[in-house]
């Protein structure tokens, strides 16, 4: 009986910590990320408590280490998206610079930097490719942020299990209907796409069919034979005027 009570109290305590850490991280995002996804990094540097609290929590708790707290696919997916965005923020505030590729690693190797998550050491690249992409939901690419202007914007709220599909659809619509990410040139018969569609084409499948699931005010039949070209990727920092 005593063991059952202890286990129950432990479960409640951890679940409460998860809720509190999520709420604090959500408050941080709403305070320091504007509606366009620009981040006030200086504000987070000056007030890092919420981010550090969240990072401290995820060091111990993950869907792998504590599966009983993550009993749906959406709860797992939301967790890993939030974790990815949190550790990218941590990289940026610990290494202020013009862009993420300026951080003291060799080029894209910055994404190999490992963080302790649920007792394991995992990198952003591992989380993206070995966890999130394995979930077979291309919308995750519109929810994770690499601290760069061409990257899908960092939202000013966390992803939550209950509203995850709505949030991911919202992010897909926002990204695809931004002409900086999807632009149709009717004179040249070309569709210009953000380079993430090239990098992760395997996830999206037929690119024209995929974008027209979310693209408004255009007719698929008018452009189905257009060529596809890709914008140059802008790695400059997604920061506000700090």
Q: How would you describe each model-predicted region?
A:
Residues 3-14:
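Sec-dependent N-terminal signal peptides
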Residues 18-242:
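Interaction/scaffold regions that mediate signaling and macromolecular assembly across diverse proteins
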């Amino acid at each position: 009986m005593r063991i059952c009570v202890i286990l129950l109290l432990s479960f409640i305590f951890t679940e409460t910590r998860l809720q509190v850490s999520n709420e604090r991280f959500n408050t941080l995002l709403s305070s320091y990320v504007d509606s366009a996804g620009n981040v006030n990094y200086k504000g987070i540097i000056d007030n890092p408590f919420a981010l550090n609290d969240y990072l401290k929590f995820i060091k111990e708790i993950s869907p792998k280490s504590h599966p009983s707290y993550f009993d749906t696919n959406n709860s797992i997916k939301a967790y890993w998206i939030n974790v990815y965005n949190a550790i990218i923020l941590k990289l940026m505030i610990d290494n202020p610079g013009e862009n993420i590729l300026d951080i003291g690693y060799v080029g894209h190797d910055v994404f190999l930097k490992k963080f302790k998550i649920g007792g394991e050491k995992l990198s952003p690249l591992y989380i993206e490719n070995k966890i999130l992409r394995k979930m077979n939901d291309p919308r995750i690419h519109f929810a994770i942020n690499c601290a760069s202007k061409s990257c899908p914007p960092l939202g000013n709220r966390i992803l939550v299990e209950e509203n995850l599909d709505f949030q991911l659809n919202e992010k897909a619509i926002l990204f695809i209907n931004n002409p900086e990410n999807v632009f149709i040139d009717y004179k040249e018969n070309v569709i210009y796409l953000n380079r993430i569609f090239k990098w992760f084409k395997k996830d999206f499948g037929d690119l024209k069919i995929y974008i027209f699931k979310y693209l408004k005010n255009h007719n698929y039949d008018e452009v189905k034979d257009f060529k596809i070209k890709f914008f140059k990727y802008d790695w400059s920092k997604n920061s506000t005027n700090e």
